[in-house]
């Protein structure tokens, strides 16, 4: 794709563009013509990176022009660079003002070369609408001054443009990953009815938190998740354990942010650990097609050595936390074992059940309930052990296994949609009993949030990428 162009190539492309503009003005009298190209120095005008930035730019231009009637919209992708031609029924100067706001308001907008042609064929300039010349990409002086004096090499300008493109999409990826993590936490608490857990109906077995406490916490944690994704991006191609080490201090700061938001209540300590690792793993995998199995296994590579070390220390009588004490007494590894194993419960149980429920036609709430029941049936939840003892946790698991068996049979018979109402009634009754007993499967709730995060990232991938609303030209 990175074919070099000559001066005659560019001159021919410019003339073809001018002819297309004249044709559109003749076809649509009184309309304004918008032409989008990329401001890329040098003989290489079309690469995968440039096309990616152009797709983003075209989507933004169309969003800006959305209030106007679009009369024509087409794009070409030649070696001289991608171009879009859009004709709208609008006053040309008003259009130019809007598009200059795009060019000046977004960092990547500096690479967009947007011309607006008035009905008389004249090009509306920035000075026509009272704006100064655009700034140089390298020194921030007026770009025309640097261009005339050739103050910078073509290679330096080309390198800077590509760095800007990379930075934009990496930032968009990190922001979108954080949005999905926050969305996962909000959806997890919204899933109702959940036995013993905070949901939209009640606070379950908890007397120090409710659904609003969770909302406050999830909002406070979004910057942390974005930071985790950025840390993963910075460790692409590097040591996974070093990436995990880099998460430790941000994780402690996130716990502090959570407690500030909740008045000291621990709503998401487990999710700070699990989803933080997941966001970093997603960052480490950036640039390749999303593979959830690989993403979760990379979580194991990141944490495995340290988690095994902590569990072995607990076994040797050096337990520092309740989770380590449980491992010392009962051999239940909890979230440490889950992480070290690449979150097998998410890969093999929660996510497949969530996807099966959605495929069966269930709404997200009900599919997530099915996934939660499957987790409660198959995992040893240290939070349930802490609150209900080993016997209480075992009883919870047994009841979940019975209910999960019914869900599996309903799925196999293609009857889950018909039976989900009755299953939810049983979950409501179970919630009353679990709440009265003070048992809360918080570890399973965190794993459900992990499954939701992976599902949302897969959804993004299916919609064209995990980079926000960059769109396609």
Regions found by a protein language model. Give the residues of each.
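Short, hydrophobic/aliphatic alpha-helical segments
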Residues: 247-264, 423-437, 455
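Long, contiguous binding/interaction regions
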Residues: 1-63, 77, 97-170
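Phosphate-rich cofactor/ligand-interacting catalytic cores and adjacent structured alpha/beta frameworks
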Residues: 163-240, 244, 282-432, 473
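Short, well-structured hydrophobic secondary-structure segments
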Residues: 33-91, 209-236
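Short glycine/serine- and small hydrophobic-enriched flexible loop segments
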Residues: 223, 277-284, 452-459
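Long, hydrophobic/aromatic-enriched structural stretches that serve as scaffold segments
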Residues: 227-284
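Short, conserved charged micro-motifs
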Residues: 46-47, 92-99, 290-294
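Asparagine/serine/threonine-enriched low-complexity, disordered tracts
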Residues: 460-472
């Amino acid at each position: 794709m990175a074919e070099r162009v000559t001066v005659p190539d560019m001159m021919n492309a410019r003339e073809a563009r001018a002819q297309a503009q004249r044709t559109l003005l003749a076809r649509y009298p009184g309309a304004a013509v918008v032409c989008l190209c990329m401001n890329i120095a040098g003989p290489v005008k079309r690469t995968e990176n440039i096309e990616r930035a152009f797709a983003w730019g075209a989507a933004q231009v169309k969003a800006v022009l959305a209030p106007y009637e679009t009369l024509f919209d087409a794009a070409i992708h030649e070696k001289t660079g991608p171009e879009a031609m859009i004709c709208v029924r609008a006053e040309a100067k008003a259009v130019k003002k809007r598009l200059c706001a795009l060019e000046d308001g977004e960092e990547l907008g500096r690479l967009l070369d947007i011309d607006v042609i008035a009905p008389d064929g004249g090009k509306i300039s920035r000075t026509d609408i009272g704006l100064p010349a655009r700034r140089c990409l390298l020194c921030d002086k007026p770009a025309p001054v640097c261009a005339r004096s050739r103050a910078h090499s073509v290679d330096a300008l080309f390198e800077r443009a590509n760095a800007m493109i990379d930075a934009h999409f990496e930032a968009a990826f990190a922001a979108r990953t954080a949005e999905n993590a926050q969305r996962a936490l909000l959806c997890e608490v919204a899933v109702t009815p959940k036995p013993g857990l905070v949901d939209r109906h009640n606070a379950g077995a908890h007397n120090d938190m409710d659904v609003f406490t969770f909302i406050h916490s999830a909002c406070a944690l979004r910057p942390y998740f974005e930071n985790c994704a950025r840390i993963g991006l910075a460790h692409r191609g590097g040591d996974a354990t070093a990436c995990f080490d880099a998460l430790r201090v941000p994780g402690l700061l996130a716990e502090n942010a959570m407690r500030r938001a909740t008045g000291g209540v621990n709503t998401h300590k487990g999710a700070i650990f699990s989803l933080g690792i997941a966001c970093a793993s997603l960052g480490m995998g950036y640039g390749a097609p999303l593979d959830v199995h690989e993403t979760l296994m990379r979580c194991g590579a990141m944490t495995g050595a340290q988690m095994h070390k902590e569990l072995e220390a607990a076994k040797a009588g050096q337990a520092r936390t309740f989770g380590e004490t449980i491992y010392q007494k009962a051999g239940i590894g909890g979230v440490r074992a889950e992480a070290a194993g690449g979150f097998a419960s998410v890969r093999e149980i929660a996510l497949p059940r969530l996807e099966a429920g959605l495929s069966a036609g269930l709404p997200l709430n009900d599919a997530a309930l099915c996934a939660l029941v499957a987790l409660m049936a198959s995992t040893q939840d240290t939070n349930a052990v802490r609150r209900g003892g080993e016997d209480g946790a075992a009883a919870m698991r047994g009841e979940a296994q019975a209910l999960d068996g019914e869900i599996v049979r309903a799925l196999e018979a293609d009857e889950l949609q018909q039976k989900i109402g009755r299953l939810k009634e049983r979950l409501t009754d179970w919630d009353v009993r679990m709440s009265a007993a003070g048992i809360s499967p918080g570890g399973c709730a965190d794993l459900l949030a992990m499954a939701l995060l992976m599902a949302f990232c897969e959804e993004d991938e299916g919609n064209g990428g995990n980079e926000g609303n960059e769109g396609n030209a």
